[in-house]
Amino acid sequence: MLSPLNVLQFNFRGETALSDSAPLQTVSFAGKDYSMEPIDEKTPILFQWFEARPERYGKGEVPILNTKEHPYLSNIINAAKIENERVIGVLVDGDFTYEQRKEFLSLEDEHQNIKIIYRENVDFSMYDKKLSDIYLENIHEQESYPASERDNYLLGLLREELKNIPYGKDSLIESYAEKRGHTWFDFFRNLAVLKGGGLFTETGKTGCHNISPCGGCIYLDADMIITDKLGVLYAPDGIAVYVDCNDNRKSLENGAIVVNRSNHPALLAGLDIMKSKVDAHPYYDGVGKGLKRHFNYSSLQDYNVFCNFIEFKHKNIIPNTSMYTNSSW
């Protein structure tokens, strides 16, 4: 068995590949061994562009940002050219005009392996929960405490929020669908990666017949630049994420999430947390705490060691290029 850091660097960099008959390598964390599960060369790559201001695009423009500072559309097209044997999905959402939707069609026609997937066309209902149930569960929890231990201010807020749920909008998913900030982006990224291959197959797009609905996907932010084919990837228990490092302090990020199967239990754990809190965050809770729960991370472990264990990096990906420019939002 190899150390977690060495296995991840060695295999993610695509410098070796295990044969079909070779036993899988294993890595350990918190006293438990995990197989380095393969993510094969047919696994689709997924990008995402949720556009809060579609009116900023001119006539004949694909409504995905493509400026000198933020060449996101060019990065997606470049990935499609390099990974020409993979399906490249782009999950999109926004109040697009008819003409802008035609531009998406033109993009698909010009690059046959690019598939535009509209968020509203994907069935995410299996991941939903009534907002009223979330509020009621939190209210009942507060009410179960002795009177001296209750947070009466919070209890009042919860009751007020419960009353203010709009008619016909009693849905966790619908509440995020109406947002136009980073949590809008982050929440549906989590659901898309949970669906994995099913995100591609259920939309009926041509060219997706070789994708298994139970398979995984490789999610990359549009500021991640692919420079060559990724090959076969390996991840502990079939999941890994991008890790940022600033002044030797590491942190889990959601700019890249790779999974070998749909409904990965680490992301399901994060979704369970999202469904239990009224103030949950799709990045901190849905990804970070979900991973920690799944892999039994606690404050007793070294956080940097955990980040090394779960890190996705690849010699053929230049990550997080937008860190050098201002936000595109």
Curated annotation (Swiss-Prot):
Keyword vocabulary terms for this entry: Glycoprotein, Glycosyltransferase, Manganese, Metal-binding, Secreted, Toxin, Transferase, Virulence
Family: Belongs to the glycosyltransferase NleB family.
Binding of Mn(2+), residues: D223, N320, S322
Designated name of the protein: Protein-arginine N-acetylglucosaminyltransferase NleB
Primary location group: secreted
Consequence of gene disruption: Reduced colonization of mice in single infections and reduced colonic hyperplasia.
Catalytic residues of the enzyme: E253
